[in-house]
Amino acid sequence: MLKTIRKHGITLALFAAGSTGLTAAINQMTKTTIAEQASLQQKALFDQVLPAERYNNALAQSCYLVTAPELGKGEHRVYIAKQDDKPVAAVLEATAPDGYSGAIQLLVGADFNGTVLGTRVTEHHETPGLGDKIELRLSDWITHFAGKKISGADDAHWAVKKDGGDFDQFTGATITPRAVVNAVKRAGLYAQTLPAQLSQLPACGE
């Protein structure tokens, strides 16, 4: 009887140990898969705002944290694109604080000479059917920033047409596109200041 109990106890202990090990292995595999998927999604988003042929470094690993009013309140990530180890452009997180329904989060690609290479909205709460046309899945409006040059803080072209600029507003919704245009302009201007301050910026994760 005692031998049987001991035998069953050992079997249960081995089973428990095996189950724990299997669970840990599955959890680790799941974490790895999630991390890989997140990395692929991030790269796909980068490719939408910065042409891949313009750089040859690992963009996600060239990440810096900046606190700059031009990008919005708090810290924002900036990714420096390099060609043969020479900084050539940046992908910047930026916030348009003055959307119709609150802050609009953006990703802006820009070189250091004042040209915006691409823009995408990553988060917003704008009105469906009106301000949400800033989303690529609903309209190509957001793609019209690519290739646009900023000639300085007073560049009148960088405004919606209602304000005398070059960018369309939406029917029944001017506040949202105005907020995005202004935020992209600020980010593009800020990008020009990055080369001079790279050595002082903290890396992401520090």
Swiss-Prot record:
A single GO molecular function, which one? electron transfer activity
Q: Which UniProt keywords apply?
A: Cell inner membrane, Cell membrane, Electron transport, Flavoprotein, FMN, Membrane, Phosphoprotein, Translocase, Transmembrane, Transmembrane helix, Transport
Transmembrane segments in this chain: where? 9-29
Q: Which residues carry this modification: FMN phosphoryl threonine?
A: 174
Superkingdom field: Bacteria
- HAMAP family in UniProt: RsxG_RnfG
PANTHER family assigned = ION-TRANSLOCATING OXIDOREDUCTASE COMPLEX SUBUNIT G
* Protein name, per record: Ion-translocating oxidoreductase complex subunit G
Which species does this protein come from? Escherichia coli (strain K12)
> Which gene specifies this protein's sequence?
rsxG
